């Protein structure tokens, strides 16, 4: 689990998943159960989580898809306690559900379609 761009008031929660589609389904199920809206993008995600995905471990980044972050206008004024709290709740629910699962809900494998893309992304 990786977090990037958390705390923006404007925008929506996006779970960037580099892994099997079943990972996306499970994360959406957890988000729904937490009452926190999120969308999922099943793709190579430009984040620190790629180092895990590259080694075959399904990876996820929680991203707040909004405006102004990672730009010259990026200031603390763009952060929202409400948004940060919701991100923390969602991450906590995901960690709790997956960490306490009697049987882990998906395999530790990477879809073939991502393996070549990850090699290229990591300049291998």
Each PLM stretch: what is its role?
Residues 67-124:
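His/Asp/Glu-rich mid-to-C-terminal helical/loop segments that flank catalytic regions of hydrolases
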């Amino acid at each position: 689990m990786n977090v990037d761009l958390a705390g923006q008031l404007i925008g929506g929660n996006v779970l960037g998943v580099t892994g099997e589609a079943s990972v996306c389904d499970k994360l959406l199920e957890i988000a729904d159960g937490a009452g926190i809206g999120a969308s999922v993008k099943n793709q190579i995600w430009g984040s620190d989580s790629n180092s895990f995905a590259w080694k075959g471990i399904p990876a996820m980044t929680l991203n707040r898809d909004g405006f102004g972050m990672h730009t010259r206008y990026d200031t603390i004024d763009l952060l929202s306690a409400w948004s940060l709290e919701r991100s923390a709740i969602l991450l906590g629910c995901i960690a709790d559900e997956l960490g306490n699962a009697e049987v882990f809900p998906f395999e530790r494998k990477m879809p073939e379609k991502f393996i070549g893309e990850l090699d290229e992304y990591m300049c291998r």
